[in-house]
Amino acid sequence: VTATRVDVIGVPMDLGADRRGVDMGPSAIRYAGLNAAIEALGIPTRDHGNIPVRVAEEASPEEARAKYLPIIAEACELLALQVEAVVREGAFPLVLGGDHSIAIGTLAGVARARGRAPGVIWVDAHGDINTPITSPSGNVHGMPVHFAIEAQSVAPERIVFIGLRDVDAGERRAIRELGVKAFTMSDIDRIGMAAVIAEALAITIDGPGSLHVSFDMDGIDPTEAPGVGTPVRGGISYREAHLLMEAVAASGALGSLEITEINPILDRENQTAILAVELVLSALGKTTL
């Protein structure tokens, strides 16, 4: 990590998802000892608290094809402003979700501050590249890549999906047509995580601070990360996830990171949040030896 300080930003967003509880993710990750663990690596932290997000009870879904989109966009704009300010200060933004719709805000903030779109490694069981028209559910957490590309916060040729195993027909089409590099679990089985990582870094990195990692905890196998709203069997292993994060750290290019989709209601004794903290530490440079 090139920055001298890690700035934590919580986004208690659950309007993009069907199952309630993912708004408690930022608290769960903090309870798992995030800030103290980062400080123990010798990196100062600053916690900005949480971005205000309206709760579902005071809002209406409005447009069925993209439920709560205006309210999600409002929170994402506040997040973008905060992330932009952090990056301009020379600090490292660590964003805690919340559902994956928050990536719209994180990526916008990073792109504005750096004056260009970052390369993005997107770890996820799902494609998250539906449009309001192709989405079967109308849930915005399945659309952030579409909206980020539309806003020019990311270029399709500089985003890499890792861990895909549940992809909608419209998403398959979008991935093909846009030329997005996507590694499914079958690809990881076939060529190994190390080869996947090498290719992903080659595609996404373009100088120091040019890499953003957007990590949906449902990318990991549910036996290791049960506390997610949309679990899919056969995911990334504990060891593969750490290998990825250690490689990201070793690249020296990581400029920002977000962890999304932890749902403490569905978790077992906060194990998914504890794993998230371990993965953050690996991404920030913690190694076994």
Language model features by range: what are they?
Residues T2-M13, R19-L94, R112-A113, K181-L289:
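Catalytic cores of soluble, metal-dependent hydrolases
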Residues D18-R20, G105-L107, T131-P132, E171, ...:
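Short glycine-/acidic-enriched loop or helix-start segments at secondary-structure transitions
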Residues I43, A155-E157, E177-V180:
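A short helix-to-beta-strand connector/capping loop
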Residues R88-R158, S251:
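Active-site histidine-anchored catalytic micro-motif
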Residues G98, V123-A125, I162, V213-M217, ...:
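Active-site flanking residues adjacent to catalytic metal/cofactor-binding acidic residues
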Residues I102, A125-I129, D166, M217-D221, ...:
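Short, glycine/acidic-enriched loop or turn micro-motifs at the edges of active sites
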Residues D166-E177:
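Short, glycine/polar-rich helix-capping loops at beta-to-alpha or helix-loop-helix junctions
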